[in-house]
Amino acid sequence: MRVSRLMLVTLRDIPADAEIASHQLLLRGGYIRRVTSGIYAYLPLMWRVLRKITSIVQEEMDATGALETLLPQLQPAELWRRSGRWQGYTAGEGLMFHLEDRQGRELGLGPTHEEVITSLAGDLLRSYRQLPVTLYQIQSKFRDEIRPRFGLMRGREFIMKDAYSFHSCEADLAMTYRAMDEAYQRIFSRCGLETVAVEADSGAIGGASSQEFMVTADAGEDLILISGDGHYAANQEKAVSHPPKAIPLPASKVALLDTPEQGTIETLCTAQGLVPSQVVKVLVMLARFEDGELQPVLVSIRGDQQLNEVKLINALSRELNKGVLDVAPISADQITAQKLEAWPFGAIGPDLDDALLSGATSWTKHFLRLADPTATELNCFVCGANQNNQHRTGMTWSKLGGVPKSVDLRKSQAGDRCIHDSSQILEERRGIEVGHIFQLGRKYSEALEACFTNDQGTQEPFWMGCYGIGISRLAQAAVEQHHDEAGMKWPLAIAPFEVIIVVANIQDEVQQKLAEQLYSELQAADIEALLDDRTERAGVKFKDADLIGIPWRVVVGRDAAKGQVELIQRSSRKVQILSAKQAFTALVKDIAANQNTRV
């Protein structure tokens, strides 16, 4: 390919809406172009990258025995209603684009395909003899993101590989889950990425257990916590740990404390000579359920700890056996809208009276009370007195009428001691999620009544797994992990081209002839070469070559008359002066050795 025919348009200035390096470089390098918020065109260079990633993914999926297919992007609402996910994905801040056809039938643009694939499996897989089966597809998905950002990292249209497996028993599902784990690690390694596999929350997909694959990068949206010995890693949403030990509050009689303008843990502790671990703080949350119920929740947690809202959502879902759309703090304006008397915010205790909800217009008229073990394990503590500007000291749970249901709700932090070995300390890293695998169990097969006949002749629901990789996100994550101040540094296996030949002066006949000769030889050797034959100044070509990040650069310049060229490796910036023949030999050897083909 010749640059003059590539439609390469590079930018010198950083686009105003690009916040992170990878987004900036992909725009500046002419790889992508914004069409509208969260939607991008993949230009020729980017499409070559995406095709290479896709090829690696297909090879590794095929090697597991998975079968490639293609499912419809438009999905009927009826299937999603049967699984119980339509309301959660479309109401309020739901992420599914949805529409009505000419007959008034509701449809959704697929952000994921559990419902469709489960319905198909129920029709096609009738006997245990047909199992296990894994189907996968690579296609565009859609999410109506509230705040699209970071280019392809959080867009509204993106390319994804999603696979779904069907099994006759849980043990067989576990085997495929492990096989997918290994396949994913090979995929990311072949793509030249450093990744960490971490325990993860299953989120809206659901299921018994899941694991994310994170590309480590400073700009990562996710916080991951890793033990020093490497034996534990988890997304912060899922992480568990030992909290710091509390400093005991000396036992004393219950007494009221006047606490004006002490409505936060910090101001309370400063004024009263306390430390945060001696205080039980109470968070008043509103849970919104898929069935429309609005449930006020009192969460008690030690004063030095933070609430993990994902853990709270999961706890509520387990406690009430129904889906939770979201949780959020209750505000004074919401209380007014419910026609309730004002609550003593900043001084609320675990025993806040249910009577405060008696006149609520749309909320459940009692509090659901939960407490984190950091709070329930305190023998004596300070808490709100349920009166403005009043707290109580010397409190115990028995004096409050009993301990609320205890469940892990705290947010693990760097510096916490590890569960598996209390001598190990959690360390913090940032990560970009590029893959996620789930053991779904029977959540979808039961909801959609997708069954097979087992070896006893009776019907039972499939055991299922699902396995996703963000193809377009992976491409940008590679740039985030491999770049410098001058531009991208693509790993060889997914680079749009393997070599770029830069002719310093295209008007020089000797330079042009040597470049054309080397270009032809590289093509004949099945090396993907890009020839910069533009009439631009040499400096412009060199800057563009650095920016677009081709792994190897050959500069044909003033030494062309002597048959010599410069060979430059993009990743290391190492420069060698070689004859054209030596450069050709070195390129063939290195590229053959580093292709990252499947073994």
UniProtKB/Swiss-Prot annotation:
Q: So what does this thing catalyse? A: tRNA(Pro) + L-proline + ATP = L-prolyl-tRNA(Pro) + AMP + diphosphate
Report the top EC class in one word. Answer: ligase
One GO BP on record is:
prolyl-tRNA aminoacylation
Q: What Gene Ontology molecular-function terms does this entry list? A: aminoacyl-tRNA deacylase activity; ATP binding; proline-tRNA ligase activity
Q: What does this protein do?
A: Catalyzes the attachment of proline to tRNA(Pro) in a two-step reaction: proline is first activated by ATP to form Pro-AMP and then transferred to the acceptor end of tRNA(Pro). As ProRS can inadvertently accommodate and process non-cognate amino acids such as alanine and cysteine, to avoid such errors it has two additional distinct editing activities against alanine. One activity is designated as 'pretransfer' editing and involves the tRNA(Pro)-independent hydrolysis of activated Ala-AMP.
Query: What does the sequence similarity comment in the record state about its family?
Result: Belongs to the class-II aminoacyl-tRNA synthetase family. ProS type 1 subfamily.
Protein name, UniProt field: Proline--tRNA ligase
Specify the species.
Answer: Prochlorococcus marinus (strain MIT 9313)
Q: Which taxonomic lineage is given here?
A: Bacteria, Bacillati, Cyanobacteriota, Cyanophyceae, Synechococcales
